[in-house]
From Swiss-Prot:
Protein name as it appears in the record: Protein FRIGIDA
UniProt subunit comment: Homodimer. Component of the transcription activator complex FRI-C composed of FRI, FRL1, SUF4, FLX and FES1. Interacts (via N-terminus) with FRL1 and (via C-terminus) with FLX (via N-terminus), SUF4 (via C-terminus) and FES1 (via C-terminus). Interacts with ASHH2 and RIN1, a component of the SWR1 chromatin-remodeling complex. Interacts with CBP20, FIP1 and FIP2.
Coiled-coil ranges from the UniProt annotation: 60-97, 409-440
Biased composition (Polar residues): 594-609
Induction context: Not regulated by vernalization.
Gene that produces this protein: FRI
Listed result of changing residue 55 to I: In strain: cv. Sha
PANTHER family in UniProt: FRIGIDA-LIKE PROTEIN 3-RELATED, INACTIVE PROTEIN FRIGIDA
Matches recorded under InterPro entries: Frigida
Consequence of substituting residue 146 to E: In strain: cv. Edi-0
Bias type Basic and acidic residues, positions: 474-484
Lineage start: Eukaryota, Viridiplantae, Streptophyta, Embryophyta, Tracheophyta
Amino acid sequence: MSNYPPTVAAQPTTTANPLLQRHQSEQRRRELPKIVETESTSMDITIGQSKQPQFLKSIDELAAFSVAVETFKRQFDDLQKHIESIENAIDSKLESNGVVLAARNNNFHQPMLSPPRNNVSVETTVTVSQPSQEIVPETSNKPEGGRMCELMCSKGLRKYIYANISDQAKLMEEIPSALKLAKEPAKFVLDCIGKFYLQGRRAFTKESPMSSARQVSLLILESFLLMPDRGKGKVKIESWIKDEAETAAVAWRKRLMTEGGLAAAEKMDARGLLLLVACFGVPSNFRSTDLLDLIRMSGSNEIAGALKRSQFLVPMVSGIVESSIKRGMHIEALEMVYTFGMEDKFSAALVLTSFLKMSKESFERAKRKAQSPLAFKEAATKQLAVLSSVMQCMETHKLDPAKELPGWQIKEQIVSLEKDTLQLDKEMEEKARSLSLMEEAALAKRMYNQQIKRPRLSPMEMPPVTSSSYSPIYRDRSFPSQRDDDQDEISALVSSYLGPSTSFPHRSRRSPEYMVPLPHGGLGRSVYAYEHLAPNSYSPGHGHRLHRQYSPSLVHGQRHPLQYSPPIHGQQQLPYGIQRVYRHSPSEERYLGLSNQRSPRSNSSLDPK
């Protein structure tokens, strides 16, 4: 026992020593009032130092906490709505694929065919399956578009419309009534269209792959105009929603102006902007001409039923019609009158009569000013277009010209102007043909005069060529410059006149047998002897040397006319044109003559012996 230390026995315990326990409790009692006193004094100091009571701070903290709770609650509600929309989308997808929810519930209970472990599991199964059986009849009776509008799910509504865009008649009956189920229809519609208007004009063409997506947005805007029932008030739109829609309309117009103006916009593009301002209001920077261009380019006859219900656009139509008439756009103004159903305010007969009077006066002025058939034709064509547009407008709206426009005889005027136009075309064609003949004659005369003034060789100077065509290539396929340094194209030209190459030696012109000595005081150089020979009269191989009597053209610096001896019997005289080709230039003869005068001994080797 001595090996173990007395640890447990040596330590005093509170149960074994009651005096020690009493001492500790008394000590705690003494210390407790001190702590309370310090805390109270610190609270007194803080309250004394602060300007407001402590309970006001507590109220502020509670207010901040309530704001945080409200924010959390709002986010939680949004999340819950999003989850519900996902569940509804899944259910609708299953229904479209032919899957019945009851069958799905049966499959859900299929694993429970095994005996349950206890009664609790059975009760849990019943409570889980019961709500699903109650929801099925509610979702099955409500249309898909209505559920999406009730849930304010813009993406779900767009997907539903996109999937059924081919059946627009059904959608136009379903979507306007479905929008009434939305809590805030104006905000919901603005969220549905998004910011597709910022895309370029190519996205609004019929060939664009995004054309169907653009049609979805236009259908939602048109449905929003058709949503309220007739005579039951107007749709309430918040001010901030109007401001957001106005910003979108201004950005849309700005893009169209940069792409060529509203008058050059695509049909779908113009229709979208027109429906947007008809739904949410016309911005202040929109002019009457802008609205007129949008109505003209959008095919407003197709959406006339929706435009007539616009609380923002209909009051402005009267001013737009009047301004259009003042600008001479009577036909466009009349189309707008019929689009918005304002026939009681603007008479078609008065509008068309004013238009015909104005066009007739303009046509008479143009005829008086016309100084040529072309100007008269332009005036007649313009008047014909005016009358044709009037007839087309009356046929479109089923108006009788005899009743609405008595005394004008529009059809007879159209026939007369067409005849005048055809007659003018014939006269202008005949005049153009005569002018072309005169121009051709003048051109031929000018070319003939130029040919006369151009120097040419006479037939005696330039006889016909023996060969079919001139070619400086010899029989051995070599060019003159390749055979000898002194031979050139002139030698080939001479050979074409003198005959075949078998009778004419193509050798160096400096060969001794071709050189003829000149008289004393001549040019100081030899002249080739074959210049005046017949084709078959010379052959160096036979040993004949025929000399040419040459009279120097320059003797002691004086120029004399060239003298040629008559041809020898059996020889052909070389034409004078070829002789001129081989004649030396005057500058060269002058140079050679001066050299002979200064050094008479330089040509002593050429003197005849």
